[in-house]
Design a protein with these regions (language model features):
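N-terminal organellar transit peptides
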Residues: 1-99, 104-105, 118-121, 134-285
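Hydrophobic/aromatic residues within transmembrane alpha-helices
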Residues: 112-113, 216
Length: 285
């Protein structure tokens, strides 16, 4: 093998190895902050897992140089439990946290924003959509036409409630709707508590409709109109530290992306979004 080929191979191996050390050391999610700063992190896309957001929040919480956090939210929401987990972590971060809404911060995206001390949105931001949704598909007639029969063994009458293989009974609907409404009231209770609004007003607002940022402010659902930069400036004023650095935390990447610095968009989000379940999700068409 020619000498120059060996050199190229050696360099490639070294780069990959060095990159792996950086990844494994966790120096890409806010650990490289070297001076007192306001950290700006992003939560975007549909929410089906809380681990990435919470990992970043945890690092910012434990970094003594981070004096405050701006959470930029650009999400229509997603699964109920991950949305709740992120909300809880933001609420209990122990540092000043402001939420800054992007194009969309609705349903679960609005919920996680409620954990912040103050909420900012652009006048044109789409937010609100306070509610829960569950989409179910019934394929019984199709299965009958093609001669496919479903055999189900179950321990109770409602174990297969919502199954696509049989028609849903009224009692099935009631059982599932009871669960859905309990999740809904958990959401509205948080809105009442965090926004200081009367229950009657929240229940009027929480019918699933979306609002612009301007409408949301008029209804008391957010605090301020403005971008994340305004939020950062206001936090500096609140802390009385006008010279604080503003550090934008890099968005988390997959292990392969971290090692190779390549990224690719997949259809995974679309595949996941077809899952059956209860969602704090704004279905904006």
């Amino acid at each position: 093998m020619k000498k120059w080929i060996k050199v190229i191979i050696a360099v490639v191996i070294f780069v990959i190895f060095a990159r792996a050390l950086i990844v494994l050391s966790g120096m890409e999610n806010g650990d490289v902050i070297t001076k007192p700063s306001i950290a700006v992190m992003d939560i975007s896309g549909q929410i089906f897992d809380s681990s990435s957001a919470i990992e970043t929040l945890k690092k910012l919480k434990n970094n003594p140089l981070v004096e405050g956090v701006i959470v930029r939210v650009d999400s229509p929401g997603g699964a109920v439990t991950p949305s709740m987990e992120i909300y809880d972590y933001i609420l209990n971060l122990g540092k000043p946290v402001y939420a800054a809404m992007g194009s969309v911060a609705a349903s679960g995206g609005y919920l996680i924003s409620l954990g912040a001390d103050s909420i900012y949105a652009e006048p044109s931001t789409i937010t609100g959509s306070i509610g829960v949704i569950m989409n179910l598909v019934n394929t019984q007639e199709l299965m009958d036409k093609i001669g496919v029969k479903s055999v189900v063994l179950k321990s109770g009458a409602y174990k297969d409630a919502g199954s696509p293989a049989r028609q849903m009974t009224e009692q099935d609907k009631k059982v599932l709707n009871d669960v859905l409404m309990d999740m809904y009231y958990q959401f509205t209770d948080i809105v009442i508590q965090r926004r200081g609004l009367a229950k009657e007003k929240v229940m009027q607002l929480a019918d699933g409709r979306v609002y612009t940022g301007r409408m949301a402010q008029q209804n008391g659902l957010i605090n301020h109109l403005g971008s994340w930069r305004k939020a950062a400036d206001d936090m500096k004023d609140k802390l009385n530290k006008p010279n604080l650095e503003v550090y934008e935390v890099p968005a988390p990447k997959t292990m392969l992306e971290k090692l190779t610095e390549t990224s690719s968009k997949t259809e995974l989000g679309k595949i996941i979004s077809t899952k059956t379940g209860f969602f704090y999700l704004a279905e904006i068409y």
